[in-house]
Amino acid sequence: MDRVLLSSQLSSQTVVNTRVQQGSGGINSIGFAVIRKGSLKLRCYAIGGLGGGENLNDPLKESNNGPVLQGFNGSSASFRTVGAKITQETGDFFVSDAEGDPDKPTDGFSSIDEAIGALHEGKFVIAVDDESGDNEGDLVMAATLADPESIAFMIRNGSGIISVGMKEEDLTRLMIPMMSPIAEIEDISAAASTVTVDARVGISTGVSAADRAKTIFTLASPDSKPTDLRRPGHIFPLKYRNGGVLKRAGHTEASVDLVALAGLRPVSVLSTVINPVDGSMAGMPVLKQMALEHDIPIVSIADLIRYRRKREKLVELIAVSRLPTKWGLFRAYCYQSKLDGTEHIAVAKGDIGDGEDVLVRVHSECLTGDILGSARCDCGNQLDLAMQLIDKAGRGVLVYLRGHEGRGIGLGQKLRAYNLQDDGHDTVQANVELGLAVDSREYGIGAQILRDMGVRTMRLMTNNPAKFVGLKGYGLAVVGRVPVISPITKENQRYLETKRTKMGHVYGSDLPGNVPEEFLNPDDIAGDQDEDDTHN
């Protein structure tokens, strides 16, 4: 049986209770709660690998990397991880208001319909990619309605860089190539930049508001030809990814989607809003002040995703079958993406019913780990453990997303990255050395599959916080996180540690709610009652 080491310097009114279990099939789990004054402050679970053996390091090691829980000095523990903290979750990782009205805007934001109306009239909209304001906000307008005055406003209040969101067919027609020489491998998390352009006629240097408006008009016109543009220039076209915000929750996609919803030609103008005081990207206070002063609707990209998701469906269920597996009996669902034709599979156990509190794993394709049993990663072990846990729970869904090989770089590039790792690079450095994205996966298709299968709230099996964010806006809520901790081997030890230190992977699970009985003992309860009586 596994043990947990808690060497803590906690206040006398803080109680840490633990529970250790060894389940069938070699699945081990540990749970513990932190209780202050009878109130649950944190409840964590860690789930072990698929049995012991020589391939495991010592099940528990004292960590030199700090406390078990953030803010608790002197605590140290590791549950089959490489000196890893069991990291406390924050509210930022939880998606609330799962159902509600998809057309109802987030508090403090304008509705999508208001934004659509403003764009149709040639006015501005501010699009924000995170309701907390941690990320940027962009001024957006329709390219077909841009004029020198509006471009001058964008220059005064933005970064000075004026971009134009365009669909691939228009970029191809105008022979505008991508800026990156590796056009076939794109970082979906970043804007897809092309070479810069100016209009060939009707401008002077190309830098004035009037000149830039002329270039934008040329880009937006369906009658323009490649010879109408010169390269480089002062306008920055950005390639819109097919599927828009349902494929990538970025400003380019949001701006083009909004303009198209306004019934206009799908070409947008956008520029990042800058804080006039220090030149940094404007946060929510600055963005909302600008919106108030200039009567500009301000919208959340998450709201736009909800708006589109209510009206569109980008996956199609094409087959369902009974699927007996080594883990148990499941149902297999094959979904085809309407964006690129890729077939994805989901397996389900039990009755999803009302879709509440479903155990879910969204798993990225890894041929080397899942099929060939590669020891370089933990993918195969995580898949195995997730299927076991769903079978044991009797109810759950695993979505297997194709096209995620090597965190989105593809099989061949992943093998090249392996060679670099053998030469001393870690998994992040290897991708960077190849000129590739560290992680270009997106989870919108997986979210739509879950919605179609009836899932509404879930306990998500993951160590990766990006999956929480990737589900936002699809009418799904994450009510808890179940970590998927797999055996450490000599081959994957550095890989797992790099994911923790450089990619933000976390361990442990913060589940809000009342204190469960299994974490309490009579002394705790009596002490709490005595304290309450004193205050009464």
Swiss-Prot record:
<keyword id="KW-0686">Riboflavin biosynthesis</keyword>
<comment type="pathway">
    <text>Cofactor biosynthesis; riboflavin biosynthesis; 5-amino-6-(D-ribitylamino)uracil from GTP: step 1/4.</text>
</comment>
<feature type="binding site">
    <location>
        <begin position="405"/>
        <end position="407"/>
    </location>
    <ligand>
        <name>GTP</name>
    </ligand>
</feature>
<keyword id="KW-0150">Chloroplast</keyword>
<feature type="compositionally biased region" description="Acidic residues">
    <location>
        <begin position="525"/>
        <end position="536"/>
    </location>
</feature>
<comment type="similarity">
    <text>In the C-terminal section; belongs to the GTP cyclohydrolase II family.</text>
</comment>
<dbReference type="GO" id="GO:0046872">
    <property type="term" value="F:metal ion binding"/>
</dbReference>
<keyword id="KW-0342">GTP-binding</keyword>
<comment type="function">
    <text>Involved in riboflavin biosynthesis. Catalyzes the conversion of GTP to 2,5-diamino-6-ribosylamino-4(3H)-pyrimidinone 5'-phosphate (DARP), formate and pyrophosphate.</text>
</comment>
<keyword id="KW-0809">Transit peptide</keyword>
<protein>
    <recommendedName>
        <fullName>Probable monofunctional riboflavin biosynthesis protein RIBA 3, chloroplastic</fullName>
        <ecNumber>3.5.4.25</ecNumber>
    </recommendedName>
</protein>
<feature type="region of interest" description="GTP cyclohydrolase II">
    <location>
        <begin position="311"/>
        <end position="536"/>
    </location>
</feature>
<feature type="binding site">
    <location>
        <position position="462"/>
    </location>
    <ligand>
        <name>GTP</name>
    </ligand>
</feature>
<feature type="active site" description="Proton acceptor; for GTP cyclohydrolase activity">
    <location>
        <position position="439"/>
    </location>
</feature>
<dbReference type="GO" id="GO:0009231">
    <property type="term" value="P:riboflavin biosynthetic process"/>
</dbReference>
<dbReference type="GO" id="GO:0003935">
    <property type="term" value="F:GTP cyclohydrolase II activity"/>
</dbReference>
<dbReference type="InterPro" id="IPR036144">
    <property type="entry name" value="RibA-like_sf"/>
</dbReference>
<feature type="active site" description="Nucleophile; for GTP cyclohydrolase activity">
    <location>
        <position position="441"/>
    </location>
</feature>
<feature type="binding site">
    <location>
        <position position="467"/>
    </location>
    <ligand>
        <name>GTP</name>
    </ligand>
</feature>
<feature type="region of interest" description="Disordered">
    <location>
        <begin position="507"/>
        <end position="536"/>
    </location>
</feature>
<keyword id="KW-0862">Zinc</keyword>
<feature type="transit peptide" description="Chloroplast">
    <location>
        <begin position="1"/>
        <end position="43"/>
    </location>
</feature>
<dbReference type="InterPro" id="IPR000926">
    <property type="entry name" value="RibA"/>
</dbReference>
<comment type="similarity">
    <text>In the N-terminal section; belongs to the DHBP synthase family.</text>
</comment>
<feature type="binding site">
    <location>
        <position position="138"/>
    </location>
    <ligand>
        <name>D-ribulose 5-phosphate</name>
    </ligand>
</feature>
<dbReference type="Pfam" id="PF00925">
    <property type="entry name" value="GTP_cyclohydro2"/>
</dbReference>
<dbReference type="GO" id="GO:0005525">
    <property type="term" value="F:GTP binding"/>
</dbReference>
<dbReference type="GO" id="GO:0005829">
    <property type="term" value="C:cytosol"/>
</dbReference>
<feature type="binding site">
    <location>
        <position position="379"/>
    </location>
    <ligand>
        <name>Zn(2+)</name>
    </ligand>
</feature>
<dbReference type="GO" id="GO:0009507">
    <property type="term" value="C:chloroplast"/>
</dbReference>
<dbReference type="InterPro" id="IPR000422">
    <property type="entry name" value="DHBP_synthase_RibB"/>
</dbReference>
<dbReference type="InterPro" id="IPR032677">
    <property type="entry name" value="GTP_cyclohydro_II"/>
</dbReference>
<keyword id="KW-0479">Metal-binding</keyword>
<feature type="region of interest" description="Inactive DHBP synthase">
    <location>
        <begin position="44"/>
        <end position="310"/>
    </location>
</feature>
<feature type="binding site">
    <location>
        <position position="427"/>
    </location>
    <ligand>
        <name>GTP</name>
    </ligand>
</feature>
<keyword id="KW-0378">Hydrolase</keyword>
<feature type="binding site">
    <location>
        <position position="382"/>
    </location>
    <ligand>
        <name>GTP</name>
    </ligand>
</feature>
<dbReference type="InterPro" id="IPR016299">
    <property type="entry name" value="Riboflavin_synth_RibBA"/>
</dbReference>
<keyword id="KW-0934">Plastid</keyword>
<feature type="binding site">
    <location>
        <begin position="361"/>
        <end position="365"/>
    </location>
    <ligand>
        <name>GTP</name>
    </ligand>
</feature>
<feature type="binding site">
    <location>
        <begin position="248"/>
        <end position="252"/>
    </location>
    <ligand>
        <name>D-ribulose 5-phosphate</name>
    </ligand>
</feature>
<keyword id="KW-0547">Nucleotide-binding</keyword>
